[in-house]
């Protein structure tokens, strides 16, 4: 039970790397002394910089170094055993003579899976593993990383807002469906993805800014890291600076794979969203449920011929309803990653 508490802490630390560590996985580590005191902790912040284990061990005060041979390190992902931009973390744990290492989940990739465990045990470090429920959470945390490497495409999230009577918009005007509070949820989703895509019609009709101002208004660096794509045949003069256009989904996904972008948020409109759904190119979907029907400014129902229906998810996929920022969202998860990779 005590092990679980520290692994929970490692998981929480790992999640802090969501906006910055891609294309690397999120990893957290906690060093615990023989008396149960946390001696040091850390997480992987960004590629090329210290891994979680390095940061956690570097956080241990000099006066606590003598405690390391009786201490345990908790790591959410198997410590690496290969030389890349940084030395192997497993070798560092051995070098610092830690007594024990508790691992959240084994590296999911066959060519490196288990090698960190082997290096640790050969170096005299006791190795234990988190229970199944925590193992699943450690894997799920890195679903974007796993999706890109196993499926050869980014993790794809669909997101839209729909009126109570099932419409996403109108052909001649914008519908106000989200509240200022629920927009924060959408911007948080944007911040957790490396790229956004909308259709040509959405670009022309809505002139969206596609930034994260409602979630992290001062995060200029994060806005610059966000790739913005338009799906459709778009003239150069129509594209805002820094945005890119692709005529086909396959071209977009191939470009993202080349660029090492692990996650894509698809925001609309209906035609674009439905294209991803029909090709089974989605891993997660969020649909905000508006509280009003599609009405004009005077409260009258709009003619049906002016309305654009919301996308239709396959009936075989069930959804959960969750409350975020005071609004109900329907949430779907594709079984693909769970069935094939244990997520």
Model-derived segments and their meaning:
Residues 12-19, 62-65, 122-125, 143, ...:
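Generic secondary-structure signature for well-ordered alpha-helical cores
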Residues 1-25, 40-41, 67, 85, ...:
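Enzymes that bind and transform nitrogen-containing heteroaromatic metabolites
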């Amino acid at each position: 039970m005590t092990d679980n508490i520290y692994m929970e802490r490692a998981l929480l630390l790992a999640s802090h790397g969501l906006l910055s560590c891609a294309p690397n996985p999120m990893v957290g580590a906690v060093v615990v002394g023989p008396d149960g005191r946390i001696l040091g902790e850390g997480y992987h912040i960004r590629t090329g910089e210290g891994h979680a284990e390095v940061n956690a061990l570097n956080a241990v005060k000099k006066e606590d170094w003598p405690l390391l041979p009786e201490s345990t390190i908790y790591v959410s992902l198997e410590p690496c055993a290969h030389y890349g931009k940084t030395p192997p973390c497993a070798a560092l744990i051995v070098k610092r003579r830690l007594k024990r290492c508790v691992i959240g989940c084994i590296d999911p990739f066959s060519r490196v899976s288990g090698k960190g465990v082997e290096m640790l045990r050969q170096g005299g470090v006791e190795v234990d593993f988190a229970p199944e429920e925590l193992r699943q959470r450690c894997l799920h945390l890195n679903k974007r990383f796993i999706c890109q490497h196993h499926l050869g495409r980014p993790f794809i999230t669909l997101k839209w807002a729909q009126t109570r009577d099932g419409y996403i918009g109108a052909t001649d005007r914008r519908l106000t469906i989200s509240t200022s509070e629920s927009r924060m949820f959408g911007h948080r989703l944007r911040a957790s993805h490396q790229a956004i895509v909308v259709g040509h019609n959405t670009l022309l009709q809505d002139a969206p800014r596609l930034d994260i101002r409602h979630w992290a208004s001062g995060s200029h660096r994060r806005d610059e890291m966000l790739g913005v794509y338009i799906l459709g045949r778009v003239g150069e003069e129509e594209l805002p600076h820094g945005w890119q256009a692709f005529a086909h989904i396959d071209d977009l996904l191939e470009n993202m794979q080349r660029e090492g972008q692990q996650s894509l948020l698809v925001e609309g409109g209906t035609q674009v969203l439905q294209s991803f759904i029909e090709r089974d190119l989605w891993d997660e979907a969020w649909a905000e449920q508006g509280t009003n029907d599609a009405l004009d400014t005077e409260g009258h129902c709009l003619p049906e011929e002016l309305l654009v229906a919301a996308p239709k998810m396959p009936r075989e996929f069930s959804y959960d309803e969750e409350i975020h920022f005071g609004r109900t969202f329907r949430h779907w998860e594709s079984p693909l990653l769970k069935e094939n990779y244990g997520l």
